[in-house]
């Protein structure tokens, strides 16, 4: 199941760092990852998001609602703006805000199937067969979707 969240990508090459991209997710407290280049930063951000969402789901934690990307600002959402001990220095021309997508199912723990017997209305069974649905996958996706969008 694909999930998207906005992320802030700050670029700082002032100290010659091997990982000039610093990435944070404003909807998750203490979120941070980094990348060597834009592609690596995007990959690392997706991986961080997948691991974090899987942890939230598996531990029954409430999943935050994604912020609207249109309401975010690199300046206003700077995670260190109120930290007197740290000043985030970045190049505004190479920094950006982007949506990050992840398939949460790839990060969830045990994929071992558990047999369930259920009853559904005849019309749903008929329609499901007409659509060629995999009923187990449909139920699995619906459960994950309910948790993520609760």
PLM regions and their residue ranges:
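A short, exposed loop/beta-hairpin motif centered on an aromatic-Gly-Thr core
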Residues: 29-40, 117
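N-terminal segment of the canonical double-stranded RNA-binding domain
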Residues: 1-19, 24, 106-108
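Short, charged, surface-exposed hinge/linker loops at domain edges
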Residues: 2-6, 50-119, 123-129, 137, ...
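Short, proline-centered helix/strand-breaking motifs
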Residues: 26-29, 121
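A short, charged, amphipathic alpha-helix used as a generic interaction element across diverse proteins
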Residues: 39-51
């Amino acid at each position: 199941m694909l999930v998207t969240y906005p992320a802030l990508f700050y670029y700082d090459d002032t100290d010659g760092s091997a990982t000039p991209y610093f990435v944070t997710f404003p909807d998750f407290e203490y979120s941070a990852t980094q990348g060597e280049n834009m592609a690596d930063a995007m990959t690392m951000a997706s991986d961080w998001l997948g691991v974090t969402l899987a942890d939230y789901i598996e531990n029954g934690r409430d999943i935050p609602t994604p912020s609207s990307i249109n309401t975010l600002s690199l300046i206003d959402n700077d995670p260190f703006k109120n930290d007197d001990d740290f000043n985030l220095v970045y190049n505004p021309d190479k920094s950006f805000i982007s949506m990050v997508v992840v398939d949460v199912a790839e990060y969830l723990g045990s994929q071992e199937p558990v047999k369930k017997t259920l009853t559904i209305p005849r019309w749903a069974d008929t329609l499901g067969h007409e659509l060629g649905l995999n009923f187990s996958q449909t139920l699995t996706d619906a459960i994950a979707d309910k948790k993520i969008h609760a």
